[in-house]
């Protein structure tokens, strides 16, 4: 078992959250709320009404849990890939089959949903909870006062299954997204690296950034549905389930709604995943 990949994925994931969280908040608000006309208007309105802290709502929960989920993604990916490689009796020096990379990435993405779902719903609900900066105090009338209270409130009001609301969409987002993510990263590194050599740092940074953008291009439609299901019920219920959320959203807002936040996702994805893979490769090379 490749334990180094679990640790490296954990470090890389936590670092990536810290880099990309402000843009993630903007993305979630664009996907779930109708009061914003576009990216820059959302940024200006958030900054004006809530201050810089408005971009970091709910960050403590994902920064602590993404390290676990990212560890699962990278660790599962590497070990499944190695298993498939050995299953076909391929030698250690042979390049991995593209189908194996895709399948291993898909498995890694789906595996981390059990850990990711509760933290993600807390993150999304806190990000969507807007409050003027001058009113932020212990006497705040906000429904959720912080990550832990939000987690407990959801479990109390909606049951433990409420913490997994939108998890089907999350799995359908992360499976194909991580499959594309790892396949793109490996393909770029393979093209730009001399055979039997480790990719240089410029290649790692480029491949990491591009793979993140490609992964989000694939995952954004399910990301929109996931976010809408997660905030549904906070102030009235609109959707009866996963399929109804898709059909209702497309019917009332057009098919373009499924790509709402795509630009923000791609802008955020490049520096975030450049950082993730840089930290991942650094830790793996240190431990091996």
Swiss-Prot record:
Signal peptide: none annotated. It comes from the Eukaryota. Solcar repeats lie at residues 1-83, 99-191, 199-286. InterPro entries: Mit_carrier, Mitochondrial_Carrier, Mitochondrial_sb/sol_carrier, Mt_carrier_dom_sf. Keywords: Membrane, Mitochondrion, Mitochondrion inner membrane, Repeat, Transmembrane, Transmembrane helix, Transport. PANTHER family: MITOCHONDRIAL BASIC AMINO ACIDS TRANSPORTER-RELATED (PTHR45624), SOLUTE CARRIER FAMILY 25 MEMBER 47 (PTHR45624:SF3). Belongs to the mitochondrial carrier (TC 2.A.29) family. This is Solute carrier family 25 member 47-B.
